[in-house]
């Protein structure tokens, strides 16, 4: 792979850093100091050829000691494009009224004269010069060292009509043109769709899809630190501290109570000591204390429904058993926090549901216990069975009919020739007796007719019951 080309810094930046160290490349110093071959050619050529202020040479482009000689007189001329505008009020209608003209610029002398009281306010020209036609409006400004302005004092009636005078012809109306160049990167061309449902010319551009290449970031799934206890969690209440915290073991003795009625009747029990019991002493009747509103009793006497540190909710109440007391009502003794927690509501058990609908491509597996079924595995590709056959009696029959030929065993009859023909009787037996001597001939059985011997193989097999197709069982209807 070719080495990657690293872009070099700017020539002027290199010149600032490497000039003092003397480590500049050979092409940096001549380019900055103007000592290249092209600069030298211009320097030597400018000695004999004057190029003026064109800025071609390496000079500053300033004029010589004598300066430049202007081709025109002093001042400047500005030309504006215009076109004739027809309209306005004809000058013939202003003969009796007069015309309002601006002040006349005159060279009256070195001093500036003030407003003359005898000067007329309106000057009526004898003849208005009419321009025969100009292609443009020429505005010239003459520069002079001293300019004197003369102002006219108005005279005559106060009601003077001031009209805008416009010649009938050859009026100059200036035009201002503005050109706007839209940026195609931010503003698409407006096109009309010629085909139905064509959206290629729409201005709305939707950019979608996935990015190409590797992403610089990493997708990390957010994890909740604590799940809400309710569907609409509220702002957690700040737990009280010190003596206001009923669950504090420093200020209260925690007493778990199983019966909530004991919390309601806390403080109403009176214990009598039989040693100091007296008939004259009658205990004061205690009022029935029930669960009341917290606003009607003090903060300690009211039973509250609080959530403990473990999160369980229960009834809580602060009580003080009978102890020492003063006449001012101050009682001395420990404080007990009676607490009766409710039973915990466990989350329901998760029961795996069985799908009621089976798709067509769902594979149903049926478990079959492994046991001996009494069937033998038969190889379907084998010609003969490997199982031993039981001996059975069979007979061989030829021909179209089935004829049984019984063989009668008689004593003294030796091996002979048995001939059976289709023209003879079925039960006829012919025996040739050779006198009791053994015959050297092989017994021959002759059967009339054409015998066609053919070899045919037949395969008879039965499928194992486990290979038979089973109907799919459905759980519901």
UniProtKB/Swiss-Prot annotation:
Which is an annotated Pfam family here? Late_protein_L2
Protein localization? Virion; Host nucleus; Host early endosome; Host Golgi apparatus
**InterPro entries in alphabetical order:** Late_L2
Protein's UniProt keywords contain Phosphoprotein = yes
Q: Name one GO cellular component term.
A: host cell endosome
* Motif Nuclear localization signal per record, residues: 1-9, 469-476
Molecular function terms in GO for this entry? DNA binding; structural molecule activity
Its biological purpose: Minor protein of the capsid that localizes along the inner surface of the virion, within the central cavities beneath the L1 pentamers. Plays a role in capsid stabilization through interaction with the major capsid protein L1. Once the virion enters the host cell, L2 escorts the genomic DNA into the nucleus by promoting escape from the endosomal compartments and traffic through the host Golgi network.
Q: How does it assemble?
A: Interacts with major capsid protein L1. Interacts with E2; this interaction inhibits E2 transcriptional activity but not the DNA replication function E2. Interacts with host GADD45GIP1. Interacts with host HSPA8; this interaction is required for L2 nuclear translocation. Interacts with host importins KPNB2 and KPNB3. Forms a complex with importin alpha2-beta1 heterodimers via interaction with the importin alpha2 adapter. Interacts with host DYNLT1; this interaction is essential for virus intracellular transport during entry.
Give the family per the record.
Belongs to the papillomaviridae L2 protein family.
Name of the protein described by the UniProt record: Minor capsid protein L2
| Gene responsible for this protein | L2
């Amino acid at each position: 792979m070719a080495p990657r080309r690293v872009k070099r810094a700017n020539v002027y930046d290199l010149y600032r850093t490497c000039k003092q160290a003397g480590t500049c490349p050979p092409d940096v110093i001549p380019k900055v100091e103007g000592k290249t071959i092209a600069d030298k050619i211009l320097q030597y050529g400018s000695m004999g050829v004057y190029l003026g202020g064109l800025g071609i040479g390496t000079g500053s482009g300033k004029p010589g000691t004598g300066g430049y000689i202007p081709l025109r007189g002093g001042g400047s001329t500005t030309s504006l494009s215009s076109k004739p505008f027809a309209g306005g009020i004809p000058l013939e209608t202003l003969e009796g009224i007069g015309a309002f003209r601006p002040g006349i610029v005159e060279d009256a002398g070195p001093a500036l004269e003030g407003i003359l009281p005898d000067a007329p306010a309106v000057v009526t020209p004898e003849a208005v010069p009419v321009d025969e036609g100009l292609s443009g409006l020429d505005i010239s400004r003459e520069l002079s060292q001293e300019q004197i302005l003369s102002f006219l004092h108005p005279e005559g009636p106060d009601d003077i009509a001031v009209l805008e005078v416009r010649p009938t012809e050859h009026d100059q109306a200036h035009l201002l043109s503005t050109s706007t160049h839209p940026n195609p990167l931010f503003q698409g061309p407006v096109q009309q769709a010629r085909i139905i449902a064509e959206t290629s010319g729409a201005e709305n551009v939707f950019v979608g899809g996935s990015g190409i290449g590797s992403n610089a970031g990493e997708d990390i799934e957010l994890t909740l630190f604590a799940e809400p206890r309710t569907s609409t969690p509220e702002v957690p209440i700040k737990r009280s501290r010190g003596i206001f915290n009923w669950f504090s073991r420093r200020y209260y003795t925690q007493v778990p109570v199983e019966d909530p009625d004991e919390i309601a009747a806390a403080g109403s029990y009176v214990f009598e000591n039989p040693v100091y019991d007296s008939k004259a002493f009658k205990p004061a009747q205690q009022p029935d204390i029930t669960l009341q509103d917290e606003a009607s009793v003090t903060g300690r006497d009211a039973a509250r429904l609080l959530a403990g540190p473990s999160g369980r909710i229960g009834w809580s109440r602060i009580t003080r058993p009978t102890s020492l007391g003063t006449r001012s009502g101050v009682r001395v003794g420990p404080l007990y926090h009676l607490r009766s927690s409710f039973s915990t509501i466990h989350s329901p058990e998760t029961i795996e549901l069985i799908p009621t609908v089976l798709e067509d491509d769902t594979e149903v597996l049926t478990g079959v216990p492994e046991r001996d079924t009494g069937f033998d595995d038969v190889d379907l590709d084998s010609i003969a069975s490997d199982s031993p056959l039981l001996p059975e009696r069979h007979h061989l029959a030829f021909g179209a009919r089935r004829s049984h030929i019984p063989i009668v065993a008689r004593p003294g009859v030796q091996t002979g020739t048995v001939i059976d023909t289709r023209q003879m009787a079925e039960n006829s037996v012919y025996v040739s007796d050779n006198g009791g001597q053994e015959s050297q001939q092989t017994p021959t059985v002759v059967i009339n007719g054409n015998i066609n011997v053919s070899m045919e193989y037949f395969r008879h097999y039965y499928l194992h019951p486990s290979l038979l197709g089973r109907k799919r069982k459905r759980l519901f209807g």
